[in-house]
Amino acid sequence: MEKFQGYLEFDGARQQSFLYPLFFREYIYVLAYDHGLNRLNKNRSIFLENTDYDKKYSSLIVKRLILRMYEQNRLIIPTKDLNQNSFLGHTSLFYYQMISVLFAVIVEIPFSLRLGSPFQGKQVKKSYNLQSIHSIFPFLEDKLAHFNYVLDVLIPYPIHLEILVQTLRYRVKDASSLHFFRFCLYEYCNWKNFYKKKKSILNPRFFLFLYNSHVCEYESIFFFLRKRSSHLRSTSYEVLFERILFYGKIQYFLKVFVNNFPAILGLLKDPFIHYVRYHGRCVLATKDTPLLMNKWKYYFVNLWQCYFSVWFQSQKVNINQLSKDNLEFLGYLSSLRLNPLVVRSQMLENSFLIDNVRIKLDSKIPISSIIGSLAKDKFCNVLGHPISKATWTDSSDSDILNRFVRICRNISHYYSGSSKKKNLYRIKYILRLCCVKTLARKHKSTVRAFLKRLGSGLLEEFLTGEDQVLSLIFPRSYYAAKRLYRVRIWYLDILYLNDLVNHE
């Protein structure tokens, strides 16, 4: 394994030629095929974790495929004829898809090593838990309670594919890899219908890598300017991917930036800034005044439009005052709530009460959007009244019950951190009654008659693991039930979100 590590080092011109291992290094295929990156680096690749790797994509097959395509001169195929031209029994589009997958795997290897390099020599405990979606909420509860404003930014997508190619140029020195990458990208996609007709056949792993490269380019500039202008040392930039000749290019850019926009650079000197990116959006929390928040807003607009050539409207940047507005974050509605606290103090023979006010981040369930999602999937109507799931009546009773129980437990598992469980109980009620109506419709019976025949054992299946455990911890009393209603639990094993219906 140490031998593999030597060939995968990021530094050096030879390692920048990404087509070199694709063509000549057979043993690198094993690393890419069985996700051997976790052996080289304890922090597995983000790209490998976020997407499913289909076993049919073999690096050895792709290598042989490229050689045969060169021999038969089949590379030059018009995009409109991709589906009509067959090659070895498959359409040419299928082979471009295979090549794109393996290209992404090979390019991920040095980036994965660079991602883990800042953690070398540091003790990072429970790094797996840091990948959880819920791990960000305890951080926000601790930090956002001291901030005034939050900037909610929708990260724009590059419309033209050439912008993605130009972004990758900063990191890849190998010209042949770039030309091959551009060729496959244009042949694989009809870029005029990039988000419509070709969406079903696009490879998620390939374009996830392109999107992350584009976003990391933006974040590298943002954090670099903040680090250069701040008096406090920022360590957030360490986990970002540094592009080739980055400092030389940014120093020139910073010089122009200072000469033309000295006032805008001044706003970057605020050391109390927290930045979080999620689901194509980013959140910037700070203690600044409304005037400075508006400057931040137009700074992002100018950065995207002038430097990245991406059309970006100011309406995509929302300024939220946490004490008044709700921040929609990862399926929760977060806002600051004043929590009154009465403390009894006693000095010698005198006792008195002290009224304190504690600012707390309140995370609530967006019941309207969840009911809208349930209505879209035919679990209820738009008013939240449960209806039978007609498309599931052909399945067996156990299959229907398991589907509803799985969906109910997933929702309960994710929204267990809500400060108030009333909306969560309402969602559970909708799913339970929808399950009963679906089973009653299958057996051509009424809901009351079906429940009378089956008993209460059906509803016990919907009890989640946390409900059963907490009911054993707290005694069955009014105050215990009220305490259970307010218990907030954040789980550190939730790495991604799935569709409600299609999740298996």
Curated annotation (Swiss-Prot):
Q: Tell me which InterPro entries the record gives.
A: Domain_X, Maturase_MatK, Maturase_MatK_N
The UniProt keywords, alphabetically, are:
Chloroplast, mRNA processing, Plastid, RNA-binding, tRNA processing
Q: Where in the cell is it found?
A: Plastid, Chloroplast
One GO cellular component this record assigns the protein to is: chloroplast
Q: Which GO terms describe its biological process?
A: mRNA processing; RNA splicing; tRNA processing
A Gene Ontology molecular-function term? RNA binding
Q: What is its main location?
A: plastid
Q: Which Pfam families match?
A: Intron_maturas2, MatK_N
- Provide the family line: Belongs to the intron maturase 2 family. MatK subfamily.
> Could you tell me what this protein does?
Usually encoded in the trnK tRNA gene intron. Probably assists in splicing its own and other chloroplast group II introns.
Protein name (database record): Maturase K
